């Protein structure tokens, strides 16, 4: 790979229905094999379910869920004198969002509801309330960082 210059990040266009950039990014995370229309159908279907079940604005539920799942710290492996240490580091804001979206997707995939839209709706509602698989993953990452606090002086 050439090392001439850093390639600029492309801006994601907001989604057509809600005009929200985070929703568009989430669709891109959800998309498989470039099938954006399928990802859109899943997300909008999940939002319809959220409106039916909770009676709240789906965009608000989505943003609360994302903010709840965002990790503050994570651990990175660092080799020092023949031993690997799990060093807690703060997570960059862009990575926080990416991890939260990825964890929500994976937690929704593991659920038992019939369609992906129903699974995603259930996971988003639970994450907004501070429960669910994605929240469990975030808490696990935070616990790992807390347990390895002693190695935080091995900064990167």
Curated annotation (Swiss-Prot):
Q: Which PROSITE patterns match?
A: RIBOSOMAL_S7
Record keywords: RNA-binding included?
A: yes
Looking at the UniProt record for this protein, which Gene Ontology cellular component terms does it annotate, in alphabetical order?
small ribosomal subunit
InterPro entries hit by this protein: Ribosomal_uS7, Ribosomal_uS7_bac/org-type, Ribosomal_uS7_CS, Ribosomal_uS7_dom, Ribosomal_uS7_dom_sf
Q: Which one of the record's GO molecular function terms can you name?
A: rRNA binding
- Key words of the record: Ribonucleoprotein, Ribosomal protein, RNA-binding, rRNA-binding, tRNA-binding
GO annotation (BP), single: translation
Record note on quaternary structure: Part of the 30S ribosomal subunit. Contacts proteins S9 and S11.
Query: What NCBIfam families does UniProt report for this protein, alphabetically?
Result: rpsG_bact
Its biological purpose is as follows: One of the primary rRNA binding proteins, it binds directly to 16S rRNA where it nucleates assembly of the head domain of the 30S subunit. Is located at the subunit interface close to the decoding center, probably blocks exit of the E-site tRNA.
Q: Which family does it belong to?
A: Belongs to the universal ribosomal protein uS7 family.
What is the name of the protein in this document?
Answer: Small ribosomal subunit protein uS7
Originating organism: Cupriavidus taiwanensis (strain DSM 17343 / BCRC 17206 / CCUG 44338 / CIP 107171 / LMG 19424 / R1)
Q: Which gene encodes it?
A: rpsG
């Amino acid at each position: 790979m050439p090392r001439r210059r850093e390639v600029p990040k492309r801006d994601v266009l907001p989604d057509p229905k809600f005009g929200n950039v985070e929703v568009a990014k989430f669709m891109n995370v959800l998309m498989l094999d470039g099938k954006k229309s399928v990802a859109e159908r899943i997300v909008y279907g999940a939002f319809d379910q959220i409106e039916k079940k909770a009676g709240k604005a789906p965009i608000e539920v989505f943003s609360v869920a994302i903010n709840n799942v965002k990790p503050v710290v994570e651990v990175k492996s660092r080799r020092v004198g023949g031993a690997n240490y799990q060093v807690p580091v703060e997570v960059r804001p862009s990575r926080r969002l990416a991890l939260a979206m990825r964890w929500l997707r994976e937690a929704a995939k593991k659920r038992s509801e019939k369609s992906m839209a129903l699974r995603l709706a259930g996971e988003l509602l639970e994450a907004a309330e501070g429960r669910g698989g994605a929240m469990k993953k975030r808490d696990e990452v935070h616990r790992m960082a807390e347990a390895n606090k002693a190695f935080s002086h091995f900064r990167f």
